[in-house]
Amino acid sequence: MEGKAADPLLCDSLILWLQTFNTAAPCRNVQDLTNGVAMAQVLHQIDVAWFDASWLNRIKEDVGDNWRIKSSNLKKILQGIMDYYHEFLDQQISEELIPDLNKISENSDPTELGRLMQLILGCAVNCERKQEHIQNIMTLEESVQHVVMTAIQELMSKEAMGPSASDVSSEMEQQLKKALEDLQEAIAEKEELAQRCQELDLQVAALQDEKNSLVSENEILNDRLEQLDDSLDDPNTVVAKKYFHAQLQLEQLQEENFRLEAAKDDYRVHCEDLEKQLIELQHRNNELTSLAEESRALKDENDILRAAADKASKLESTVEVYRKKLQDLNDFRRQVKSLQETNMMYMHNTVSLEDELREANAARAQLETYKRQVQELHNKLSEESKRADKLAFEMKRLEEKHEALVKEKERLVIQCDALKETNEELRYSQMQQDHLSRTDASRIKSHDNLAAELLPVEYREMFIQLQHENKMLLLQQEGSENERIMELQKQLEQKQWTVNELGTEKRLNKERIGELQQQIEDLQKTLQEQGSKTEGSSNLKQKLAAHMEKLSEVHDELQKKEAALAELQPDVSQNPQKIGELEAALRKKDEDMKAMEERYKMYLEKARNVIKTLDPKLNPASAEIMLLRKQITERDKKIEALEAEYKLAKLRDYEENLIVTAWYNKSLTLQKLGMEARLLGSGGACRDGPGRSFLAQQRHVTNTRRNLPVKVPSATSD
């Protein structure tokens, strides 16, 4: 008996019995039952009052591969069963029938799982609705019924023995187990503490060694310091000379430090301007970050909708498989019912033949008793015996014929099943051909009607709800795109306004340069008309020489700024902050140019006043004036080149922003097209291609998305 209960056949038979309850959780194999959800639902159906909804809610459904949660669910189920036996049925469960839950949750042991399902079977056959559950057991196969009945007998026999003599021993065993568990925990804690002490000892030893090494190094450094002090006291030593030389270098470095501090103040002002620009760029970056977060949120929602659509398609295929299995099950039940009726008819025939055989034997006994008295009865008895032999022969012949008919029937049933499968395949192929031969409009309509009939009501509602959410998302996305377009238009207007300002400044600079050239020409004419004296020409030469030195300084400063500007030339697509630095450097350069122009005007006024006072007759400074004019033209060319580079940098930035915006808009459009194609489902599939599967449709949408051209608007130059 115990060998049968522990056999895996018991587990498989009880799984078939659990499937008669039609639970929401799957219970097809051992892996489906290890989490305990299906068994808890079966107990809830067995006795709703005892295993109520609150008890059922304590069983966690989202278990996954976590064996601890599985073990917790199984412990709750076993505790509920033991309470039901003890309090409701007033029975005690034998220790041999209690399963090992750890083996079930960790190893999916079918033997221990069979013991647990055997206890659930005991609850079913002892509850108030036991007749209904016994009727359900009788509907199973004969072999499964035999295994289930054997398990019930084993359960009843072990419950009948009772644990009256083993209560004390079981309590002692439990106390002993608990004491052993406490002892193991204490030993584990002791080992952990010992390991921790060993680690601390190693750390203390390492710190002690480090301390000793530091003390020795400190002593060595003190000795070296004393030697250096002794050597510095003597001025003739090499160390003293090096010390004095170091003092001189220190003074020079201090003077250079003063100069660097002055330059630092200038750079501090420049840094403040850059910080202001950085704050503005940070505000702009925050706005772009918020827009990026919104786009990521929309992308996440799109992924969720895509996952929901995939899940819906998988559930549809699962429903189709279950529907086919249900049809096969109904056919099998009808066949079993017809076989049972035939078996009952054969049993009635056998009983009638046995009754006739008993009557013949009784008649034979009577004929033997009256054989000596009546000879006629003897003859009659012989005739009856012959008749009985004939009937026995006929019965044997009928049995052989019955066996042949049974075999022929089995063969015909197998052929019938094969013909049914062939018929189903031919019908399915015929339906496909009819479906391919219809027109596009009728094909779309029939496909939609078939999908509507196959889809359950809850999936239809979910599909309609997803369509509504898709429309709402499209409206929201269009609003966000309009806002993005408005912002880009504002930025474009601001850029154009900045370009216009720069053009105005350039025109004013050209006018100023023209005025300066006119002043130089006037000065040259005045010098040619009036001439110069020797003393006045020497003073004018000194003034012009000073002026030329300052112009050379300005030219050197301009070259330095050009070098700094070349170093600050950014990669606009990678670091927009460098663009701000370049603009700040350009503005500072313009300010420096304005300051140089003011100084130049001041020098011209001074030179004109000197010329008027001296009234020269000669023109010795014409060469210097021509050189000055040439330097001014070179400076104008450099200014124009820098302005052109600045415009190119701004145009490059503007083009990249437009490319990013166009790519963003195009990706959103493609995502909307892909979402609409997936949500339209079969309708879109019929329009695209009549014989295309779901995966082929997805590949077609992906290829269409890749083949769509991306148009980037060209940047307009001012």
Curated annotation (Swiss-Prot):
SUPFAM superfamilies: Hook domain
Primary localization class, coarse: cytoplasm
Subcellular location: Cytoplasm; Cytoplasm, Cytoskeleton
Gene Ontology molecular function: dynein light intermediate chain binding; microtubule binding
GO cellular component assignments: centrosome; cytoplasm; FHF complex; microtubule
Alphabetical UniProt keywords: Coiled coil, Cytoplasm, Cytoskeleton, Microtubule, Protein transport, Transport
Coiled-coil stretches noted in the UniProt entry, renumbered to this chain: 164-428, 473-652
One of the protein's GO biological processes: cytoplasmic microtubule organization
Keyword flag Ribosomal protein: no
CDD domains: HkD_Hook1 (cd22225)
Domain Calponin-homology (CH): 8-124
Described purpose of this protein according to its UniProt entry: May function to promote vesicle trafficking and/or fusion.
Entry's family note: Belongs to the hook family.
Subunit-structure text: Interacts with microtubules.
Name of the protein described by the UniProt record: Protein Hook homolog 1
Species whose genome carries this gene: Gallus gallus (Chicken)
Source organism phylogeny: Eukaryota, Metazoa, Chordata, Craniata, Vertebrata
Gene name in the database record: HOOK1
